[in-house]
Amino acid sequence: MMQRCVWRLQMPLALRRGLASGEAKNQGVSPEAEPLDSFERQYLKDRIEISPFQRVILGAGSSIAALLDPRRHDMIACLGETTGEGALENILDTMQASEEGQRIMAEKPRIHTSTIDFKLLESLPADSFGAAYVKFLKDNQVTPDSRMAVRFLEDPKLAYLMTRYRECHDLIHTVLGMPTNMLGEVAVKWVEALNTGLPMCYGGAVFGAVRLRPKQRRAYLKHYLPWALENGKRSKPLMPVYWEKRWEQKLQDLRAELGITVLNKV
């Protein structure tokens, strides 16, 4: 497994960067490079290069900081990038295995207020996924523009997948019917962990639960945790879902398609 990951991180990256023929030959790769798209070009300009040792230090430091203060979203983001390459490789395989996932990787859509027509979503039927997403944002007073940029991943394709994961987080909340309070966040993290395999999701689920108050913890253990584990194991892969093409779909139908059930009010 380790050999497979090393090959995929070194060889395709050299190709995707569009190295000159001489450089490509020196690195033992074919000079025919896969052209970079706009996301990949911009990412390679902005990314921060770190050594394997620096990656270990960043991973350890960010995990401690995130544990001490879960509000440090910058540390949580750093932890996700320094520990998630293996899981992202598996997610990439999943994306490439479906037509919908392939389309996402080819088009690399972004989720911002500048890319989503929220007036259109507000005009959709109340039982549609798009209308439910707008309601979720308003009810929880959140915005899709608050996600941190990816900086520490080497492979731009994996960087896009991490970006996509972050920008789709509120969409996962919506389809799961979970609010952004502590109980809701921990439950969603369990579903994401089991669905994506990202270590930071497991960390957020485990350590987030530790910080629950006694009353919350009882509800978590009796209702939220069993529900989250069941949905995380049973649901179809969520990363290959082209959410932006599902706005008009009935939320109930989308949940049925993905194998998701909603937690009854407790």
From Swiss-Prot:
Entry membrane topology: Peripheral membrane protein
Keywords: Lyase, Membrane, Metal-binding, Mitochondrion, Mitochondrion inner membrane, Ubiquinone biosynthesis, Zinc
EC number assigned by the record: 4.1.1.130
Keyword Lyase: yes
Enzyme category, top tier: lyase
Lineage: superkingdom: Eukaryota
Protein purpose: Lyase that catalyzes the C1-decarboxylation of 4-hydroxy-3-methoxy-5-(all-trans-polyprenyl)benzoic acid into 2-methoxy-6-(all-trans-polyprenyl)phenol during ubiquinone biosynthesis.
Cofactor: Zn(2+)
Subunit structure: Component of a multi-subunit COQ enzyme complex.
Pathway: Cofactor biosynthesis; ubiquinone biosynthesis
InterPro entries: Coq4, Coq4_euk
Record organism: Drosophila ananassae
Pfam family, one: Coq4
One cellular-component annotation, GO: extrinsic component of mitochondrial inner membrane
Cell location: Mitochondrion inner membrane
Protein name: Ubiquinone biosynthesis protein COQ4 homolog, mitochondrial
UniProt family annotation: Belongs to the COQ4 family.
Chief location category: mitochondrion
Miscellaneous notes: This protein may be expected to contain an N-terminal transit peptide but none has been predicted.
Positions annotated to bind Zn(2+): H169, D170, H173, E185
Biological-process GO terms, alphabetical: ubiquinone biosynthetic process
